[in-house]
Amino acid sequence: MNVPIINHPDYVAQIGDDHRFPIKKFGELIKLLKLKNIAGNDNIFKPMEVSIPTLLNTHTEDYVSKINNLSLSSDEIRKLGFPLVESVRRRSFVATGGTVLASKLAVKNKLACNTAGGSHHAFSD
């Protein structure tokens, strides 16, 4: 079996073309993996959003609620480094769900890759 590749179209959040973070790289990566026949219908897995209870293993209830309800303060948004819009919230939850799925598939298959890796902008609170 080919290495499981976890990917979701929502990994490319709508943060604006002028944002310094190259968010489009996540869409380009899956295109390249397909072009090189590394990823295909048989080994691409689409994650679901991570559950709130899973998030609460690491983050405070207040922080998760603020992210989920798009209600961070302007200082908290600045610290996060991304605009707080639904596509960013969705991407965060789906990417984390992708990490959970990759972990489960790696246990079963010895290896798995989440194409949303490298987005370390979360805080416990």
What role is predicted for each listed range?
Residues 1-125:
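HDAC/HDAC-like amidohydrolase catalytic core signature
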